Each structure stands twice: as C-alpha cells, then as structure tokens.
C-alpha cells in the first residue's frame, strides 16, 4: 500500500463505520473504553494489523513516512473515532522524530525495527516543575567512568507502562545554558526496578485513554551508547525535531471538529422544532457554517505548513508554533459553539451522541499538550521583526505545491531542520502579491482588508525592539504574534482557492469569503457574520458531504 489514498481508504474500511454500535472500533466502543480510562482493545488490534506505526518511520528505514501532510491526513481517520487512541499512537512520533533527527545509523535502525514491529517508544521530556521550559529540567545524567548514571523524576510520560524504549531529555551539565541537556535513547529493560520507582498514573479529564505515568530514578547506570546525538545538544535537537510534532499533532486534531460537526448534524437533522428540522433554524445554520469554515481554515494552514517542511524547511520554526497556536484555539472554540447547539445532548454519556461529550473533553489538551499556546507566541516573537521586514521588502508568490490537491514533494530532511527561519516564510511573503492575482470580484474587498492589516502589522513589527520580544513581552506585543498567525492562515486559504481544480468547491469564491470573514473577525477579536449567500453555500456543501459520507476537511475523501 504505497498510495496514500489507498492506505487511508483501507484503514477506514478496517476500522469500520464509527456509528455502528456493534463495531468494536466505533464510537460506542470508544466511549465505553473512555469510561474505563483506556482505549478500545479491538481498535488497538486493528491499528496493529494495519501497521500504523510504519507511518512514522521514514521510507529509507523501511517505513511509509515520505510526506508529512499524508501522515497527518491518514491519522485523522484514527483521531475522528477516538482522539485518545490517535494521540496514544501519535505519541510514538514525539519520541521517534528525535531519533530520525539526531540519532546514529544504528539508533535509527533500532527505532525503526521497534515501530515496524508494533513496539512503543515513550517520550520523557517534560517535568511538572518546569512545564514548557524544558531547558530548566532537572532529571540528570552524570558521567561515571565509561557510562552514565541517571537520577531524577519524570512525572508525565504517555504510555510509559507499555514502552519498549524511551527517549529522555536529561541534564548532563549542572550549569545552566543551551548545552546543559542531552537526549538519551534507551531500551525500557534498562529501567531496573531496584533503581526505578514507577509513579502512580495521572488521571485526566480529557484524553482519558492516554496512560500518563511517571518514574523516579535513583542512580541508574546506563551505557554511554544511549546518548542520542552529541552531548549537550538535547534542547537543540528537540527544538528542531518538535517542529514536526507541534505542527502535526494539532493538524491531526482537526478530525475532532469533523466528528463534532457530524454528531451535531445527526442530532439537528433528525430533531424537529417549530415545525422544521432543528438544522434549519437560523442560529443553528450559522453555527454549522462557521464551524465548517473554521475546519477548512485549520486544514488549509496546517497542510501548507506541513508541505513547507519539505519545500522550505527553514520555515518550520515559524509555522509549527503558528499552527499550534491558531489551530488549537480555533478547534476548541468551534467545538464549544457546537455544544451550545447540542444543548443537553452534549453532556450525555450514553446513546448515539455520547461521543460528543468525549470530544468536548478531548479537544482541550490540544491547546496545552506538548506545548502551550502561550508558549507558541513566545517562540514566534524573537523572529517576528525579521519575518515582517523580509515580507515587506521582498514579497513573492508562494509555491503552488504548498496548496495544490496533488503535489510532488521530496522526502523531508529531518536532520536539516533549523532553529530559526532567517526571516524566510513563503506564506507571509505571498501576501504582498495576492492583489496582483485574478481574484473573485466578491472576495477582493476582503483580500484588500487582510493585506492592509498585514501592512500595518509589518509597520508595527519594524518598531519592535529586542528587549520587547522576551518571555515577559507585554500583551500588545504578543498580540502582534497572534495577528501574524491569522495572516498566515489567510495566505494559506488564498493559495488553496487559487490552485484548486476548476469546478471544485474549494475553487469557489464562497468558501474563500467565508474563511477571510472568519479570519478578519479573529484578528479584530470581534466575530463577523458570514454574508447570507456565503452562509447558504457553506451549509449546502456541508449537508451534501454529510449525505455522501465525505470528510468535512480539505480532501473531502470518503469516510466509512
């Protein structure tokens, strides 16, 4: 199965219709497993049969990973049924991407062999005392003779109890600084019970099926060969490797909004109020149209950013935090608005709508898991003046391959990912040229509004001083970074519309007008209503896809 469409279709068929109450990999099974704070065993077995973890292994090592955007799209088939199941499997990417980025040939082969055999690799980076500040981590690896001795605590490790190996961030220099930490890749059987105490599992409100465990290590000897990359490069490696995951994990999570929309439609199209379908009530139609638009916005930005990792990998340090910040926020808000439409049905834990309350809980960690949205703005700020300055001085159209339905891309060069973009961002740079394109007449005023907003953002960025761009940046400065993410999303939507095949829904001006209207409201922090004709077109497309069992995302591919 080399073709992504074939693989995605095969996985959908293996997992079956999520609405089938007797399907052991369906919504009912996912909700029942969630009540037990686990994932459905039958669904786990299907993913093992499919060899899902091969999607995270580069083709050069025997896996299927050659396109990050394809990996994301396939994983949406898992996330849409059970986000916890999706995250538990995607957690292997958190660990393995560090191995692909900095590991020796032998370490890469070992990691690939594990994953291709359905083994698990846990990622042990964060510590509760330091949150997103991994440079402050205290878990230590001290050199003793020809080996290392590990000491410290890691309290929140996903699926530690099922791990065959771990990637650990450890302090190898007691002095603070950028070279104070290293990464370790070690087999789980080195965790001798005499020196390793397993900590109680953390219980969570959302993603309850993801088993969060911890360990307290005291003077554990490990061989020097467990070092992953050069000593002292642990934080640098993570900063480069996690560009993939900070982009990919929120992008996979658009499937949560797809399911929330699907459940809301199932409820409102069957329920009658005031002599008509509840779905026909104006407030309900508006909410459905806006949520559908938000889903397309999120996928436009995340697909463009994922492809940019192939085409212009230096932009990953910008696009990854931008995607995490905007997509996580939009998804959470959209699901909450749909909950108001569901009314008392949204918190039911039984019946065919029970998966909705699970989605409401599971979407929240998208905003703070792995890295918090606030930390994403902090990551963007130091690069903002350079990005805005270059976009203003040297605007250029973005490559079509960022947006088109089909694009030929080279395999990602993960070791080549960089810490900074050097001011290069093809999405931002394209906003200075979009008014020269053949735009739909009805959409041009909205495009002009976004271009004016970006010009104003560039002017504000030029006035920023280095001391304003630190972790203690004032709220107005942080808002500039938030506005930058909105501009990137607008550029992505414009590119998707421009390159869409003639006759395709994404080539129509209505969805572009809807997207730019929603984004303008986000930038001003004042929601703007969709024009009536635009709202009607969005609802019509949404209902048609619902009738034909198609994805609500950019691909519109068939779902089981």
Locate predicted features:
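Extended amphipathic alpha-helical segments with heptad-repeat/coiled-coil character used for oligomerization
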Residues: 305-399
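Glycine-rich beta->alpha junctions and the first turn(s) of the following alpha-helix
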Residues: 204-294, 402-488, 492
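A short core secondary-structure module
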Residues: 153-197
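A short, Trp-centered hydrophobic/proline-enriched beta-strand micro-motif
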Residues: 55, 117-126
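Secondary-structure edge/capping motif, primarily at the C-terminal ends of alpha-helices
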Residues: 268-275, 302-312, 341, 438, ...
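N-terminal glycine-rich flavin-associated loop
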Residues: 86-106, 131, 147, 269
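A structural signal for short hydrophobic beta-strand segments in well-ordered beta-sheet cores
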Residues: 140-141
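Amphipathic, small/basic residue-rich leader segments at the start of a protein or domain
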Residues: 1-90, 110, 417-472, 481, ...
